[in-house]
Swiss-Prot record:
Organism: Pseudomonas aeruginosa (strain ATCC 15692 / DSM 22644 / CIP 104116 / JCM 14847 / LMG 12228 / 1C / PRS 101 / PAO1)
Domains as described in the record: Contains an N-terminal helix-turn-helix DNA-binding domain and a C-terminal domain that binds the effector.
Assigned GO CC terms: protein-DNA complex
Record GO terms (molecular function): DNA-binding transcription factor activity; DNA-binding transcription repressor activity; transcription cis-regulatory region binding
InterPro entries listed in its UniProt record: HTH_LacI, Lambda_DNA-bd_dom_sf, Peripla_BP/Lac1_sug-bd_dom, Peripla_BP_I
Oligomeric form and interacting partners: Interacts with PtxR in the absence of 2-ketogluconate. Binding of the 2-ketogluconate effector to PtxS causes PtxS/PtxR complex dissociation.
Described purpose of this protein according to its UniProt entry: Negatively regulates glucose metabolism by binding directly to the promoter region of the kgu and gad operons. It also negatively regulates its own synthesis.
Gene from which this protein is expressed: ptxS
Descriptive protein name: HTH-type transcriptional regulator PtxS
Stimuli inducing this protein: Expression is enhanced by the global regulator MvaT, which binds to the ptxR-ptxS intergenic region. Negatively autoregulates its own synthesis by binding to a specific operator site within the ptxS upstream region.
Any GO BP annotation: regulation of DNA-templated transcription
Residue ranges flagged as DNA-binding region: 14-33
Length: 340
């Protein structure tokens, strides 16, 4: 082996490995491409020594592109600061790693132009499939991309896309919440949600809430969005007379944080004057007062399942689009202690 070929800096190339081993570039390509059985044992040993000496790392992206495979999965999220998105992303990334894929995450920060930019970027990265948890304000671009590669939606249905969806069973979660609150003696329920903004999961929860309240004559219910009028609406709810003890049902972690801050600022004693049940389970819920009762979403399983559906499509599954939903798990804490 010619041991004099040692690059002083920069990325080691396949040509340098071939020169150091005294073999052709094609032989090195066969070696790193898994076709070592085509090489003489002595040739393979020289290539191995050269790779070790030069600390050569094959460019996996380039190798993948030559074979039509990058083993990259794209994930588009609306808000990377949202704990739900982070938790689902963890499940997706874990499943990707277990199957030999890498995850490329793009955060739109709820910005329409960023969403458009990231869709173009992900396409340029040659991702093999895409997982989408975003506002979907560019259905044309999403449809065009879906014609080229498989796509799975998380949490939010986009009417323009006929593709798999993985998320929570929203109707069941609302039923669990109202069953628990009613059993604990609450009668006046305020559902708190982020602005609907066409987001299917938020709309489904509001619709399920209104329908369930309509079937429960003992309960009174109303809906309040966390917009500029939220503080005034919350104050009005707390001060109004009603059929009995009051409770808030917050539809996600962001709404829960907003509601607890406003309750504190309004001087409301948590959780003596009003009960609270939150959808999503966040690390800080047990730390507030006597703890916030929660409906935990199986975020890790949702993320894993989203990747598994995408993998099935990559492997040739051509069945009609499926909706895979999971039930929430009720975790009871002091915020919904029984009322007389």
């Amino acid at each position: 082996m010619n041991g004099s070929v040692l690059p002083s800096r920069g990325r080691v190339t396949i040509n340098q490995v071939a020169e150091a081993a005294g073999v052709s570039k094609a032989s090195v390509s066969r070696y790193i491409g898994g076709d070592r059985q085509l090489l003489a044992d002595a040739t393979a040993r020289r290539i191995e020594r050269a790779i070790d000496q030069l600390d050569y790392r094959p460019n996996q992206m380039a190798r993948g592109l030559k074979r039509g495979r990058t083993r990259l999965i794209g994930m588009l999220v609306a808000d990377i600061l949202n704990p739900y998105s982070v938790a689902v992303m963890h499940g997706v990334e874990t499943a990707c790693r277990e199957h030999g894929y890498s995850l490329v995450v793009c955060n739109t920060d709820r910005d329409d132009e960023q969403e458009r930019h990231h869709l173009a970027a992900l396409q340029s990265y040659n991702v093999e499939g895409l997982i989408v948890n975003t506002l979907g304000h560019h259905p044309g671009e999403l449809r065009a991309l879906h014609r080229e590669l498989p796509m799975v939606l998380v949490d939010r249905q986009l009417a323009e896309l006929d593709t798999d969806l993985v998320g929570l069973d929203n109707a069941d979660a609302v039923e669990q919440a109202l069953d628990h609150l009613q059993h604990r003696g609450f009668r006046d329920i305020l559902l708190v949600t982020e602005p609907l903004d066409g987001t299917s999961s938020r709309i489904e929860r509001v619709q399920a809430f209104n329908a369930s309240i309509g079937r429960r004559p003992a309960l009174k219910g109303q809906v309040l969005q966390t917009d500029d009028f939220f503080r005034d609406g919350l104050r009005a709810f707390l001060s109004a007379s009603g059929p009995g003890p009051k409770a808030l049902f917050t539809c996600n972690g962001v709404a829960t944080l907003c509601a607890t801050r406003q309750l504190r600022d309004l001087g409301c004693r948590l959780f003596d004057e009003v009960g609270l049940l939150a959808l999503d389970e966040l690390d800080w819920y047990p730390l507030v007062g006597s703890g916030i009762t929660a409906l935990a979403q199986p975020t890790d399983e949702i993320g894993r399942t989203a990747f598994e559906r995408l993998l099935a499509r990559l492997e040739g599954d051509r069945e009609p689009a499926r909706r895979v939903t999971f039930p929430a798990q009720l975790i009871v804490r002091g915020s919904t202690h029984p009322r007389g």
